[in-house]
Amino acid sequence: MKLSKAKQDLDHHVWKLIKLHSLQDKKILVALSGGTDSVALLRSLTKVHKKNLLGACYFHHGEDSNQEYRKEAQEFCEKLCKKLEIEFYPLRASQLAKSEAEYRELRYEALDRLKKEQGFELVATGHHRDDLLETRLIRLIRGTGAQGFAAMHVLRDGLFRPLLEISKKELKKYLREERLRSFEDPTNKALDPLRNWLREEWLKSLERRARGSTAALARSLETIAQEIENRPWGDLLGQNEAYKTQGLRRSFYLTLSPFEQKRLLAQYLFSLGKRDFSQSHLEEIQKRLDKSQKVITFKVAGCQWEVNAEQIKVQS
């Protein structure tokens, strides 16, 4: 039986990335939600990677208003793993989060712990081209600055994202041809009204007016991201040793131009896993840091800042 183009394209793409990054003998833990992206990723990996080197984890967010869906999604993921002969690991949040950003943080922390406990070397996620495009457009609209265009790498910091060049439409087609279904979260559309409008209205309207334009836009933003990353001043954060534990050096911050100061602050927030900030937040932080006081404490962008004569630090 001849393989369809969708199957060939996705499986070959994932296999090429595994080979390119020499991952043939690496143990990979798949972050499995039951949605189209993660189901397609898991299925493809079972075809191009050794099954005994694969595992899948479902992260239950806890007893919130969506708990019935979460229970059913976990059961769906467990049955899928049994069908594909993959080890399944259910995890549960130890606390309820207040926002999607907090859930994301809890999820990655739990996945990282499980990875270490079970001897996995990588966590694979189903982030795809449309996810990345929507995120960059949202950050552009909110004025996050150049850091909002940060390149998302296929392989970095123990995370493997092989679907970044694949669209959601291609993933849906792949699942249809594999005769596999997904289990979508009914609350997804309500989580971020702006993202939902971009996905369901603006991007679809753009594609109708100019076929192929969304893919071209995604490529253009990726090119910008790569150019920003490769500029000499791109990594201001790297010039602050031990920034994760000690924060930023205030003396270094004061030598920078206003533009560079905002870039450094954005890089610092991103390094701490903070994403929900805007250009106005960065400008407000700058104003607070302009004061001549040696010791300052304030709260901006959902973070508690502590400043002394030597350091600028966000309290965890």
Swiss-Prot record:
- Catalytic activity from the UniProt record: cytidine(34) in tRNA(Ile2) + L-lysine + ATP = lysidine(34) in tRNA(Ile2) + AMP + diphosphate + H(+)
Q: What class of enzyme is it?
A: ligase
Enzyme Commission number, as recorded: 6.3.4.19
| Recorded superkingdom | Bacteria
Q: Which residues form the signal peptide?
A: none
Q: Which InterPro entries match?
A: Rossmann-like_a/b/a_fold (IPR014729), TilS/TtcA_N (IPR011063), tRNA_Ile_lys_synt (IPR012094), tRNA_Ile_lys_synt_N (IPR012795)
Q: What is this protein called?
A: tRNA(Ile)-lysidine synthase
Q: Does the keyword Cell membrane apply?
A: no
Keywords annotated in UniProt: ATP-binding, Cytoplasm, Ligase, Nucleotide-binding, tRNA processing
Native organism is Bdellovibrio bacteriovorus (strain ATCC 15356 / DSM 50701 / NCIMB 9529 / HD100)
Q: Which GO terms describe its molecular function?
A: ATP binding; tRNA(Ile)-lysidine synthase activity
